From Swiss-Prot:
EC number from the UniProt entry: 1.4.4.2
Primary gene name: gcvP
Protein name per the record: Glycine dehydrogenase (decarboxylating)
Role according to the record: The glycine cleavage system catalyzes the degradation of glycine. The P protein binds the alpha-amino group of glycine through its pyridoxal phosphate cofactor; CO(2) is released and the remaining methylamine moiety is then transferred to the lipoamide cofactor of the H protein.
Family: Belongs to the GcvP family.
Alphabetized UniProt keyword annotations: Oxidoreductase, Pyridoxal phosphate
Keyword field contains Metal-binding: no
N6-(pyridoxal phosphate)lysine modifications at: 705
An annotated Gene Ontology molecular function: glycine binding
Example of a GO biological process term: glycine decarboxylation via glycine cleavage system
InterPro entries to which the protein is assigned, alphabetical: GcvP, GDC-P_C, GDC-P_N, GDC_P, PyrdxlP-dep_Trfase, PyrdxlP-dep_Trfase_major, PyrdxlP-dep_Trfase_small
Superkingdom as given in the UniProt entry: Bacteria
Length: 955
């Protein structure tokens, strides 16, 4: 191709959109860090021993338009049949006001988990609404702010039963009418935690001695029955009872809490979130007051701020993996906040009466079809149901199933029965087409429907009918016009800080650009409208997408195979450690159960190791932040016979490329162990090195970090795992789609949160080999630039051999606190006044701040951040010198709100301008925190996890 034609082409044009600093600015930045060229900086930063010998074999980057055209062709390979499969997944209408203003809105999807509550009050309110919605519909005392999927929630509930119960048995009961994908995930969890699982009809529960039981209501085949007596019998034997339930069904059905259930779990998918071939969706868990401190997942609570005003926050964080490590209630980090928010907004928009209308409509459609089929001579497996029928079709099963497929209808197929599940998208014409498959005339259906319409509970037994009110809080009874809803959504969005406002420099979080072109395909119906258990030939587009993405990831990581099933980084860790343990078992070395973990590791690492019954042995780090090789050698020697693995992060969580990483891998391999390399910091590897090249056996990748899936304010995430060939046979399987051994599932669907995979595919396709490698280099340049600008003012805790850092740096606040009395929390809160989200606080070292600017931030934003940090350091000096008292200065009083600015009283030794407009940029474009500093201790001592009364909002 001629030079002119190359210039006229659009290959690689996206790179300059993704990377923040213009190439013309690189030299200024390099001068600041003291490097001649970008390549020279990389040579001084990344050890030569781990540099890739040749570039990745990936195509040139596509333009945005070319990528979207290619991805559209892939999407159109999917076939969108009308789905009646059910089994926990249903078509739904996403209200357009929510689609446009939340799902497609970077103000919602680019925010981070609300660890900084003062700049997160909007999504905290939305998540509190979600908890209230779940509590009301399940009839239980407290709910969390989402889990990964229904099957994972069931597995978490099983372990909660063991933690919170008094029965000494090690056996867990699962009713035989629980969704099969849920049972599969429970079996995986039980095996590696040491529990037995017994599957039987729920009527036989009383004959088993078990610590917990899982029932389904309605059952997977649709049956609705009163569980009260079964639960009472279980309680008599000190057995805790979990009930998997359906939120829409709970609008008409007696809540499981009123039947005595201890725990309720399920999925909020049908509240406005597309099926997406399996996800992402928000699962829920609700429980009794007595179990609240053992419940897994994030919980939003009501507290007060420093002025005594109501403020929301994440409550009871001492249960979580980032604090409790191997003693945590769960390894869950990222959950499904964005999808939980969408579900809560669905309930807010429709309100209780709107939900009743939808539920009645679904139930009446089901009842009409039931009567029509019975009048045509078909027998139903159950007479009581909400939205699902199981039809006894005997020898006609295959014929009718095939006939339905020919009519573009998907039914659920059993050996001699067919399942039919209805949802809010079902129409009268759908019913006519469905009944035609069974040979039922439309006129018959029409005459039968008159009787059914008179009865709200057409096929629900009296003992199972809901009589209690729900969603009585004003928030669910106000915003029912689109104008009202639009303004409510905007009001909440305006309270929160996201990437639309400025840099989010959270270390170990990689808050990079989530480009619009990457996000667009997520809303395409070809990706959103497919049921995860549809026949595989209807998901040809997803198969093509998954195969292509796995190939890309193998090339990037140096691994031989990938599973896309894990739907979070923590889930990926879990799947990876299971693969290691199954590998050892296959070699008759199942006794290997010791997992070495450096003291710098992320809290999910020890929490996950504990979930697979590993013994966690901590390896020390030296004064430079590297693994202490002497201590490592001693620990390996001590545990050689039982050594399973080591979990390392690279670059290390201390923000440096450890020179001896290959030696670490060799030492563990020589002792018979496997190397798990946590992919959290993959953003500093792509194109320069790779886990496989370094010597690792397995890694998870955080697609919501390195590969541009947005954080969504706390999820969704994706944690696919890559493995070397010897571990490939031990990747997760899935029973529904018959993949890879069909067992050891870690998620409810084979491709996990499949509908967000296009985001990462699009990013890689548009960046290509050159762009991905340049992004890594620019991430390193940006981090070193920030470090060198801040180093004269703040101690940098760890640097590599040549004084360089990887993609993030840790500044040490401890000596400054000793000198000034100002803490890392004070700095974090003061940054809000300057218009920034705080860096990561006190991780991986207490009393520090970890900063990761990513490659997407431009030079002006980097300088704005550095100038804010330098200004804060000058404010600390004023405190140290006595110009401002320690208990009354802009740092300890931060953040400052509009109420502070307009207050009639001002008893501070600094001006309102210093408080609220500390920089030129803050004056030009001010982000306002909506509450003062939140009181964490008060919130946990006075735990309230439901929507506050309307009176509490009044002045």
């Amino acid at each position: 191709m001629s030079q002119l034609l190359q210039q006229l082409g659009t290959d690689n044009e996206f790179i300059r959109r993704h990377n923040g600093p213009a190439s013309s600015q690189h030299q200024h930045m390099l001068n600041t860090v003291g490097a001649e060229t970008l390549e020279k900086l990389i040579e001084e930063t990344v050890p030569s021993s781990i540099r890739l010998p040749q570039p990745m074999q990936l195509p040139h980057g596509l333009s945005e338009n070319a990528m979207l055209a290619e991805l559209k062709q892939i999407a159109q390979q999917n076939t969108l049949n009308t789905s009646y499969i059910g089994q926990g997944y249903y078509n739904t209408h996403t209200p357009n006001v929510i689609l446009r203003n939340v799902f497609e809105n970077p103000g919602w999807y680019t925010a981070y988990t609300p660890y900084q509550p003062e700049i997160s009050q909007g999504r905290l309110e939305a998540l509190l609404n979600y908890q209230q919605m779940v509590m009301d519909l399940t009839g239980l005392d407290i709910a969390n702010a989402s889990l990964l999927d229904e099957a994972t929630a069931a597995a978490e509930a099983m372990t909660l039963c063991k933690r919170g119960g008094k029965n000494k048995s090690s056996t867990f009961f699962v009713a035989d009418d629980v969704h099969p994908q849920t049972l599969a995930v429970i079996k995986t969890r039980a095996k590696f935690i040491g529990f037995d699982v017994v599957v039987d009809t729920d009527s036989n529960l009383d004959s088993h001695d078990v610590f917990g039981a899982l029932l389904q209501y309605p059952g997977t085949t649709g049956e609705v029955k009163d569980l009260t007596t079964l639960i009472e019998q279980a309680h008599a034997k000190k057995t805790l009872v979990v009930v998997a339930t359906d939120l829409l069904a709970s609008v008409l059905l007696k809540p499981v809490g009123e039947m005595g259930a201890d725990i309720a779990i399920g999925s909020a998918q049908r509240f406005g979130v597309p099926m997406g071939y399996g996800g992402p969706h928000a699962a829920f868990m609700a429980t009794r007051e007595k179990l609240k401190r053992s419940m897994p997942g994030r919980v939003i609570g009501v507290s007060i701020d420093s002025k005594g005003n109501q403020a929301l926050r994440m409550a009871m964080q001492t249960r979580e993996q980032h604090i409790r490590r191997e003693k945590a209630t769960s390894n869950i980090c990222t959950a499904q906040a964005l999808l939980a928010n969408m579900a809560s907004f669905y309930a807010v928009y429709h309100g209780p009466e709107g939900l009743k209308t939808i539920a009645r409509r679904v139930h009446h459609f089901t009842a009409i079809v039931a009567k029509s089929l019975q009048s045509a001579g078909f027998e139903l497996a159950h007479q009581h149901f909400f939205d699902t029928l199981t039809v006894k079709t005997e020898q006609q099963t295959d014929i009718l199933y095939t006939k339905a497929l020919a009519a573009s209808i998907n039914l659920r197929k059993f050996d001699t029965e067919l399942g039919i599940s209805f949802d809010e998208t079902t129409t009268v014409s759908d019913l006519v087409a469905l009944l035609a498959v069974f040979g039922v005339d439309n006129a018959e259906c029409d005459s039968l429907s008159n009787d059914i319409g008179q009865d709200e509970f057409a096929a629900i037994p009296e003992a199972c009918r809901r009589t209690s009110s729900f969603l009585t809080h004003p928030v669910f009874n106000t915003h029912h016009s689109e104008t009202q809803m639009l303004r409510y959504l905007k009001k909440l969005e305006n309270k929160d800080f996201s990437l639309t406002h400025g840099m989010i420099p959270l270390g170990s979080c990689t808050m990079k650009l989530n480009a619009v072109a990457e996000m667009l395909p997520v809303t395409w119906p070809e990706f959103g409208g497919i049921h995860p258990f549809a026949p595989l030939n209807q998901a040809a587009g997803y198969t093509t997408l998954a195969t292509s993405l796995k190939s890309m990831l193998c090339e990037i990581t140096g691994y031989d195979d990938f599973s896309l099933q894990p739907n979070s980084g923590a889930s990926g860790e879990y799947a990876g450690l299971i693969a290691i343990q199954r590998y050892h078992e296959s070699r008759n070395e199942g006794h290997r159960n010791v997992c070495l973990i450096p003291s710098s590791a992320h809290g999910t690492n020890p929490a996950t190791a504990s979930m697979v019954s590993m013994k966690v042995v901590v390896v020390k780090c030296d004064d430079n932040g590297n693994i202490d090789m002497i201590d490592l050698a001693e620990k390996i020697a001590k545990h050689q016979e039982n050594l399973s693995s080591i979990m390392i992060t690279y670059p290390s969580t201390h923000g440096v490329y450890e020179e001896q990483v290959r030696e670490v891998c060799d030492m563990v391999h020589d002792a018979g162990g496997q190397v798990y390399l946590d992919g959290a910091n993959m953003n500093a590897q792509v194109g320069l090195t790779s886990p496989g090249f370094i010597g690792s056996d397995v890694s998870h990748l955080n697609l919501h970090k390195t590969f541009c899936i947005p954080h969504g304010g706390g999820g969704p995430g994706m944690g696919p795992i890559g493995v070397k060939s010897h571990l490939a046979p031990f990747l997760p399987g899935h029973s529904e789609n018959g993949v890879q051994g069909s067992d050891y599932a870690v998620s409810a669907a084979d491709l996990g949160s499949a509908s967000i995979l296009p985001i990462s595919w699009a990013y890689i396709a548009m960046m290509g080999e050159m762009g991905l490698t340049e992004a890594t280099k620019v991430a390193i340049l940006n981090a070193n630039y920030v470090m060198d600008r801040l180093r004269p003012h703040y101690p940098v805790l760890y640097r590599g051999t040549n004084g360089r850092i990887a993609h993030e740096c840790i500044i040490d606040i401890r000596p400054l606190k000793e000198a000034t009395g100002i803490s890392e929390e004070d700095i974090a809160k003061r940054l809000m006044d300057f218009g920034f989200h705080a860096p990561t606080m006190s991780f991986p070292v207490a009393g520090t701040l970890m900063i990761e600017p990513t490659e997407s931030e431009d030079l002006a934003e980097l300088d704005r951040f550095c100038e804010a940090m330098i200004a804060i350091r000058e404010e600390m000096n004023k405190v140290q010198q006595g110009e401002w008292p320690l208990d009354n200065n802009p740092l300890v009083n931060a953040p400052h709100t509009q109420v502070d600015l307009m207050s009639n009283e001002w008893d501070h030794p600094y001006t309102r301008e210093v408080a609220c407009f500390p920089s030129v940029q803050a004056k030009a474009s001010k982000y306002w925190p909506t509450v003062n500093r939140v009181d964490n201790v008060y919130g946990d001592r006075n735990l309230i996890c439901s929507c506050p009364s309307i009176d509490s909002y009044e002045e």
